[in-house]
């Protein structure tokens, strides 16, 4: 994902500072995007996937205002966390097969969003998609395991992603040193083990 052209330029998770994270005002978002476009060190944006569409308010607006030269990534963490509020076993690593299949459907929608961006801007417009090894686990609740995550990874890898890399965004895991994790997804060791297979 690093090229000579990308050195000194960054993928920015600007959505977290957007004036329209929870409400929609097209004018203020346009000002915000135009300011982002003026920053030469921005290589692309980390675009949040909330679970239903490319943009939480207006897909066409995003397609009309995203810089066509940017190389972006789609992060599925926001949508995953939203799902987990009501479906605590939701995720690619879920030991509950129905919840794991629901996560696969979620990622199929994300896959379609990636293709929508690529069809509009070209193949280089989405260089990666961040996935997670949800759901939660600790010493009392064990909703996830490496084998379920591996099964999901194999299914996602069978889709035609082209030049878009599937990237596991490691989140905090339950350990003796971290007995009350915020997310509590799989350990990095289990994630790496699943990826290697």
Language-model-detected regions and their locations in the chain:
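Active-site acidic/histidine proton-transfer and metal-coordination neighborhood
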Residues: 1, 86-196
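N-terminal pre-domain/capping segments
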Residues: 1-112
